[in-house]
Design a protein with these regions (language model features):
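Flexible, compositionally biased loop and terminal segments
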Residues: 14-252
C-alpha cells in the first residue's frame, strides 16, 4: 500500500510526513547514542571496522528518517572523550570514516538546508578532520530548517567544565549567574532547541553515559535492545510513538 503523506508546516517549513504521524507530538530534538557497532561485528564474525562502517551507513539513513518526521534537531554522539582509550588502529579508522561522514553530510546539508554544528573539544581532533568540520559549520551556518549536532570528542562533564572555563574568561558574576546565562556557554548555545526531548540508545545499554547532562534534565529515554547497525526506520517510528504516549511533567 502506498504511504499516505500529508503536508504540514513544521519549524516554519512545509514538509510531507506520514499521515499517521500527524496525530503524534513530534519531538523538536532527538539525540542518539549509537551503541553496539563492535558487538554487532563480533556477532556476525566480522572485523570491528565493518561494524563501524555499517554504523556510519545507518546513521545517514536514520538522519533522513528523523528529518522526514519533522524533527528539527538531531544530535548524533559520534565519539566520546573516553573513546581515545581504544586501539590506535581503531581510532585512526574512525577518524578517516568521520571525514567521509562529514563530507557526505555536508552535501546533504546544502541540499536540505541543514545546519551542521560540532559539539565537543576541538583541540584533540586530527587537523584534516577538524578542517572538514569547520568548513561544514561555516558553509551551513545560515541554515535554520534543521540542525545536525555531531558530538565528536564529546563528554557531558567535559562540556560543563569547558563552559565554566569560558565563564571565568568572560568575568561573569558567578553570584548572580542564571541558568540561561550558563546555557549560553554550552556547546548548544543559541540553538532554538538545545535540550533533547528524546534520547535513544541502542544495544540494550540502559545508561546515559553523560550525554548532554545539563540539557537532558527532562529528556525522555528509550533504550532499544538491538545494536546500532541493525537500527531501522521502524525503530524510529516506535520511539517517536512511545515518546508521544508519555506525559512530560517537567518537575510539576
Amino acid at each position: 500500500e502506498d504511504l499516505k503523506l500529508v503536508c504540514q508546516i513544521l519549524n516554519g517549513y512545509a514538509i510531507l510526513i506520514p499521515i499517521e504521524m500527524t496525530l503524534l507530538h513530534i519531538p523538536n530534538h532527538i539525540a542518539i547514542i549509537p551503541d553496539g557497532n563492535r558487538r554487532w561485528a563480533k556477532e556476525h564474525n566480522l572485523p570491528t571496522f565493518e561494524g563501524h562502517r555499517r554504523g556510519f551507513d545507518v546513521a545517514t539513513k536514520i538522519g533522513k528518517k528523523i528529518r522526514s518526521l519533522g524533527v528539527h534537531t538531531l544530535t548524533m554522539w559520534a565519539f566520546s572523550t573516553e573513546n581515545w582509550e581504544r586501539s590506535k588502529d581503531e581510532i585512526n579508522y574512525l577518524m578517516r570514516m568521520y571525514e567521509l561522514f562529514i563530507e557526505k553530510n555536508l552535501r546533504q546539508a546544502l541540499k536540505e538546508k541543514i545546519r551542521i554544528i560540532h559539539l565537543g573539544r576541538k583541540d584533540r581532533i586530527p587537523k584534516t578532520l577538524l578542517k572538514r568540520i569547520q568548513n561544514s559549520e561555516e558553509k551551513t551556518k545560515t541554515f535554520d530548517k534543521y540542525i545536525l549536532n555531531i558530538a565528536l570528542d564529546y563528554g557531558g562533564t567535559d562540556e560543563v567544565i569547558r563552559a565554566i572555563h569560558r565563564l571565568s574568561e568572560d568575568n561573569i558574576d558567578l553570584n548572580n549567574l542564571t541558568i540561561e546565562q550558563f546555557s549560553n556557554f554550552l556547546d548548544t548555545a543559541n540553538q532554538p532547541y538545545p535540550n533533547p526531548d528524546l534520547i535513544i540508545r541502542t544495544s540494550g545499554e540502559q545508561r546515559t553515559s553523560g550525554l548532554m547532562i545539563w540539557q537532558a534534565a527532562y529528556a525522555e529515554y528509550i533504550f532499544l535492545n538491538k545494536h546500532f547497525p541493525d537500527l531501522k526506520n521502524e525503530d524510529i517510528d516506535y520511539a517517536v510513538e512511545e515518546y508521544a504516549r508519555r506525559q512530560r511533567r517537567f518537575g510539576k
